[in-house]
Amino acid sequence: WDGRRVHLPLRCTVRGEAFGQPDCGTDMVFDFAQLIAHVAKTRDLEAGSIVGSGTISNVDRSKGSACIVERRTLEQLDTGKPITPYLDFGDTVRIEMLDNDGRSIFGAIEQKVERLA
């Protein structure tokens, strides 16, 4: 954390396979001070408010992706067709960020795609 951006990788897995580890601060267009200022123009913010920065991606493609649509678009541009499948019933997505000592910052978020009953 540099006061405006978190500079750690977001570990993303899809179907139990590594999908990406983009660095959250690298290539971030708007820092959190700018995001909070913008959000505060249209609503009250209180302690505990959560402000999201949108999807995370890096210019350096070797870091992988945190967004299936972004990856499919890059594949379309590179090869003429998307390769990565969309999520299907039974698929699991997991994201987690670890600090420099390997401790989870916010706990892993893991969700499974299931049919509504």
Residue locations for each model-derived region?
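Catalytic-pocket segment enriched in acidic/His residues
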Residues: 1-117
